[in-house]
Design a protein with these regions (language model features):
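Surface-exposed, low-hydrophobicity beta-strand/loop segments enriched in small/polar/acidic residues
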Residues: 1-108
Length: 108
């Protein structure tokens, strides 16, 4: 098999399959991982989706330890440590207390 280089991979071209505009910064589920919209992506249009990097994201209640695997819960639109019914998001690069509203997540 021959592999042909396409792009560095920190961001990918993503076609919005929905009838709604994806907002810049919005989390997008890719089934087994997440991406973050780098720009607004209108319905059926192609836009930039970050798939590597560190992002500050809203989190569910509860503490998150440094290094913990974290997941994106689409129904709450928050990061959690609960894998059930959620999409793998990455890992916490810093601890977050229960009362913290956000957590820093390394995706990709």
């Amino acid at each position: 098999m021959i592999a042909n280089y396409q792009q560095p991979g920190a961001a990918i071209d993503y076609t919005n399959p929905t009838s709604d505009t994806i907002k810049a910064g919005q989390v997008v589920s890719l089934t087994t991982r997440i991406g973050i919209a780098g720009t607004e992506i209108p319905a059926a249009a192609v836009g930039s989706l970050h798939v590597k990097g560190v992002f500050t994201m809203d989190k569910a209640s509860g503490a998150i330890a440094l290094g913990a695997a974290v997941y994106y819960n689409a129904s709450t639109d928050k990061i959690t440590t609960t894998a059930s019914s959620a999409v793998p998001a990455g890992w916490a690069i810093a601890a977050a207390k229960s009362e913290d509203a956000t957590v820093q997540v390394c995706i990709g």
